[in-house]
């Protein structure tokens, strides 16, 4: 079992490193073709930081492991909200720029309501569900880019009429490292999936539980890094805004893409009080934790230490119920 643990960790490292390389290279390419910093941040960076979750969920769904695909997406949202955001709030409560929260929060609750209703009513995530989620993703991205364009100043746009040989070399380098980043993410995702499954068998734990906890935590490490960096620099509002955006993309992009490519049934490999824990634990915790995070931020323009403490308690209970009940 030790070898599977080590390979699981190697997979996480490859995922995270590959994601970093992909984002850096994508930003370099986008700048070369004259995109503004705002649009790069709203599209390239936000998508790039979600690639680890996307590769794991899509890869799992295509290989017939819908439990891991579901658990990774839902578990990442819970981890982002009730652990990473909660720690940020608990350590340094702060005032919040509501503009960073409002649009992604609205889109999140609309898309998650559709996601949850599909699960409760049909017990499956169909291709139709995936297409609707991807449509919401496209609408959100269009809205974000359109909004960003309104804020572009001329000094943020790279002039394209003076391309030098060194810039062409840099472009080639960015394209090469972009490919390397994708390869690392793909390798890491495969290692994570394969060894996550083997660990679940070895420990006698359902695959959904492994995905909701260990895999979800691993693929959320980029958000944790961003949160810590933002806290150190005193940008708590930006950190929470990034987390809300990441949660939205986990629903509309990660889940939407994986379900569209390979529909799967709602996991039913773990029961709680004789009922499917996906319906009475996972998805309710996902919605409740986001409500606890967003309502005070949207209504008061501030987050409080007690919020962080309560969310951390929720995450602790959630993990306890996954492993010990």
Describe each model-derived feature in a short phrase.
Residues 1-325:
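Hydrophobic alpha-helical segments, chiefly the membrane-spanning helices
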